[in-house]
A protein has these predicted regions:
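Short, structured surface patches at the beginning of a domain
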Residues: 1-108
Length: 108
């Protein structure tokens, strides 16, 4: 399966608490390899809050996922909070992506 990885931190405090972008990417890559997936793209967003969708890298990833055909089949994230803090907003994007047969998978 073709997958995209999305890693994000909002603060340097998070980076110091074992949620650094390199740590997230390492875990995401290991998960993808262990599950036989091919990583097509890595999206990295340092210093961006997940309280809204005004994140340039996030928007590029969504745009790539909505291409016909989609650039990848799955967006892999470390935890749901890396994608969105708000469950309603998460659901909106999850449904939007599902219409183009793209899933969001959290490894934790």
């Amino acid at each position: 399966m073709h997958v995209a990885l999305y890693a994000r931190v909002s603060t340097t405090r998070q980076a110091d608490n074992d949620l650094s972008i390199p740590d997230q990417l390492r875990q995401l890559r290991e998960w993808a390899a262990a599950n036989g997936h091919l990583v097509i793209q890595e999206y990295v967003e340092p210093g961006a809050s997940a309280t809204d969708d005004k994140r340039p890298v996030f928007q590029q990833m969504i745009s790539d996922a909505m291409m016909k055909p989609a650039a990848f089949e799955v967006i892999v994230i470390h935890s749901l909070s890396r994608f969105f803090r708000d469950g309603i907003e998460f659901g909106v994007y999850e449904r939007k992506l599902a219409k183009n047969k793209v899933k969001v998978v959290s490894i934790t």
